Each structure stands twice: as C-alpha cells, then as structure tokens.
C-alpha cells in the first residue's frame, strides 16, 4: 500500500505474517521493518528500531542501487563463475574463472563459513540476517534489472555475506595468490587447472597494484592545529570504481543506540569509513605483512612429503570440484587436488615459487583466522570517543590490512597501525628467513618448527602481534598517512624500532606522503581549515614535477642534440604546463607521465639520492649530467612524442579530454607522481583512459557544539546500474570539484530538497 502526506511519499511494502484465519485475527508479527530516507544523490539514511530491521533496510537499499554488482560478486565468492559464464572467461580482476572458482571453493568451504558465522555476536547475526532478507525482498518484488538478467542472479544467504567478508579478509594475503594456489601440483603431475604465463603476469601486476588500487590518503587534525580547537578528518581512500571493493555511501541509525554515516564495501552491513556524533575515522592500506611464506624442504623419496624437525610428514590433500559450462551448455565437473602443510596451502608460482623435487612453498595468511572483522567495525561505528574507538581495536584486533586514522570532538587525533600481523620478530627473521629473498615477500624456513609464528597469550588470535606491540600515535597537532610505513605519521614523533614485518623506518617516503607533510608544514602559520583539507585533494598538484622540472627544462635547453626539432613541441608543452592534473591541464602532463614512468625504472636517476636524515626532501632532481640518465631521458622523450602523435593528441589537448569515467572528465592522476588525488586508469579503444580506481569516498569532517559537520561525495556515484539516475550524478559533481554537505541530523535530512521516504516491513 502507499501512504502519502504533504512532506514526502511513503511507500509501505509488507508481507504480514502470522495472521490468524479465524474471526479474531491477532496483530501481525513484524519480522523486520525499516525506514529508508533518501537525500541528494540518492544517499540512503536507514533507520530502524533493532539490528534486524537496520540490516533489512541496508540490504533493500543496496539492492535498489547495486543488485547486479552484488549478485556478480556472490557468484565469484561462491566459486560458480565457470558454471554460469564458462571456465575460460575472466573476472573483473582479469582472473581466469576456473582458477577463481577453485580458489574460492577452497577458501569458502561450508565448514569455514559455519565457523565464521558461529563466531559472530547475536547482534551481528541479526544485522546480517536482516540484510539478506532486505536484499531478497527487493529481488522478489522487483526482479532483476536489464543489466543482469540470468539464472546466476539469485536470493542470497547469510553464508554469502560471510563469503564476501572472507574474500575481503584475504585481499592482503592469499587472495593475491589465487592462481598459484589453484594450480599448485607436484613435479610430473598435470594440473587440472592450467595457468598460462600470461595469467601469472596479470596476477603479478595485480599483486603489485594492490596498494595502488586500494591505497589512500588521510589526515587527522588535533586541537592545536584545527580552526576551532576540535578534531578534523580528511578521508580520501583510493579504491576500485568497479567490482567487489566499490564503496557504498549510507547513514545508519537505531535511535538511542547508533547514529553513523559513511561508506561500506559490498555486502557489509556496517560502516567501514565514516563518522558519528563524536568520532570520525578512516583507513589507509598499510605496509605491514599479513602473511608469510614457508619454504618446505621435501622428502627426497616423495615430493608430496616434507621434512619438519627431521621427520617426514605428508602434505594434506583436498580435492576441489568445480562445475564448468561447456560450449554446448552442458556442465562438466573439473577437479583439482590442492595440497597444504601445517603452515598453510602450497602455492606454486613459476620462476618465483617453484615446486620441484627439493622444495615447495606454503603460505600462511593471518587473516584466515580473523573472524572479528565485522565485530570490529560494529564497535567502531558505536564509539563515543577516540579512546573508546582505540580500546575496541586493541581488544578485538579485527582490522585486516589497513591503518586507522581518527579525530574526535575533543580535539585529539590518532594514528594506529593496528592490523592483523604475523608475530615474526626481527630476531626470528634473522634466524629463519633467507636474506636473499628480501622483505617484499617474507620466506621463512619450513623445515624447523622454531620458525613458526610466535604466540602471545594476550592476542585475539594465536600467532599475531599484540596491539601494544604495534605502532600508534596520539597527537594534538596532526597525524597523516599515504600508504607508507608508520615511521613518519608525524615527523615530530617518528615511530621506529619495529619488526620489519610491522613497519620499516629510515626508508624512502612515497611522494604523496612528502606532499602531505610539506603541505601541512606550510600551513603552520595559521589554523588548518576545511578549505585547506579540501585543497590538498582538489588542487591536483603534481608533487614530482616540483622536484624534477627545473632539470627537465635544463635538459630541453641544452641536451637535445640532433633531436632538438623533434622534441621541441614536447619541451614547449612541459614549459607551459601548470604542473597540475586538472581538467584544463595541458599536454605537458601527458608527456610528464610518460617520462616519469620510463625514468623510474632507471637506476641512479636522481641527482640527489635518498638520505634517511632528510626523508622529506630526498630524493630530488634528475641526474641529467650522467650519460645513462641523459640517454634514457632522450629515448623517453622520443617515445612520448610518438605515443602522443599515435593517440592524435595535439598542443590544444587537455587532461579532461583524456582521463574520463564514461563520458565524464576526471581530474587527478597517477599516485607515483605524488598526485594526492590519485587515479588509476586503463586505455580505451578511442584513445582515452578510463578510471578504474582512485579517489572514491571523500569526506571532510569537523565538529562543533551541535556534533559533526561533514562534507563529501562518492566519486563514482551511488549506483552501478547505468539506468539509474544516481549512476553518474556524483561523478559529475566530483568532476566539478563540488563537495556537498552530508545531512546527518533528522532536521538536515528532512530539509534536503531531494528528500524521499520509504517504509518497508516484513
């Protein structure tokens, strides 16, 4: 039925269960009910009286906006892509369907899903059950959009939400080794899942891009630097614009218990990044290790047995079977035997982690034991102070692979590198790891049980570091982070002395972090304002240009030689470029991107090398007087000219003509150049570059006597359905650099010009 009043349209959709068929019908039993209020850009404000009702509203609203996205991800995490789409097709991450299915069938076994579910609190279970009911209700009432017609779109279960959550957990670990796990086979045995060299190249690229596609910037300002003596927070996570890591903006309220707004990942009925009445927080991908590899010494008599403390042990075998669609539409069962040691599954990466007659490699992922992640964000959503938020993270240790930065209404700022990290001390690394492997991948000796992770009885799970052993810093001026180690979250208070598995110090800072610290230092003469934080992102300064442009222009003036005529247009474009990545920035930006991409592969290209004593100002300059660098630069210039000509770009081309989302021009650019507003793109057939990851949910939160005052937007918009009016509206606002106030109070919500209301119950 539809109920209307003068202020809003209220739609009540309900199946009234429990009605007596007798003459004296009793009151209907309401299993779940919620109110969904929508404001500008369609942002849902979901209100309910209990957890089940709140979950019901979240699931219903999410289905309205992103049904096809979630349905696709459910197929993926259920290991059913081959069944519906064929084994040779690929996921959004360019992963072969069959390898993906074998991996997720291994990861999300019925036992693993049940164990995770049983570890949840009643409140979390009720929230998830409500979410499932709400999503299914919308699917039942409205069917599937044109975007995703097919048998693969189905009702979901609480188990599906668990599977989605477990996929999130292993993104920083074994999830990066899906192909290596799915195809691992003993020497001389043919794998059921064949992985080509190309697939491993893609996997390697995805692994290297993990921190780029899921990077972030964050600044938390304390009372000493804030314009009003209260805390301030800039949240600028860089996350994918498509797929299973695409944020969703929402506001959740249970009167008297919960009032929190922000963004959540698909399938999660909690806020991951956001704010409430007293606290605002965000996350940045950390540099801590969340898994280690173990090199197994194999039994010389049998390559499916390994030696541990001199004893021969068999590798455990598990057979995984996937249904694969054939060209004629029939299904064929494809089986693969997977192996594991007591340390974890065996992974095989040709040329990198080979399984031969002498050695094999197991991977132990700390987050496979993390069943606390939903409870963690549930607790953070309710935190009434910075101390309460910090205490919850110490107690639960549920943050998987990110740092946390937060500020509160009392004017404190906080940085915590408190994620799930294997307890491997510096001493154990020295004893058990091969120094030739370096620190990019930690490879421990699997032949000795003494090399197992240490156990601290104070931890939330066995084998990880205790919270008080991890980096954290509370300040009244500021903390910042841009995906570097914990070392210089605030240069006035360096965080040092940790195991390299946790955080390294006295290593080079990334250019975004250098930009952020120098920008914050430049503001020391006055209080930091909301506008200052907004400009950090929206100015689109190319930090690296300031470090090398004088040398580039000198090279143009003195070192072009016989190529002077061919390279003069490039040099002119560099000289006239504004050294920003705005929509109207000129062709010099394209050339600069090309040149730096090439030069960053050249050893000793810096004129002044990194100096640990001067981490904020080194390295800098280009060593154009060194012949190898000069030669490489000249070659890069010629290649860039050829590339620009091939794309049909001219001196009048602008960045907004090149970097786009659909037809919408997008500012920002590659994070490697120190562009705070980082964007990752892929080339399109028409010569443009399509944004696939980068600035996503953007929020700037301050506090006053009335509570939080927030502005922000979701750069890729709320809905992934191209037919939705909310598929591109915030993207256009982002293109125009227009952040909007985020309505938080009931009065602000109802005063919104786009206010609509929907009541649902079941």
Predicted region positions:
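C-terminal/peripheral segments of proteins
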Residues: 26-554, 560-563, 567, 572-762
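Sec-dependent N-terminal signal peptides
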Residues: 10-18
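Bacterial N-terminal signal peptides that target proteins for export
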Residues: 2-11
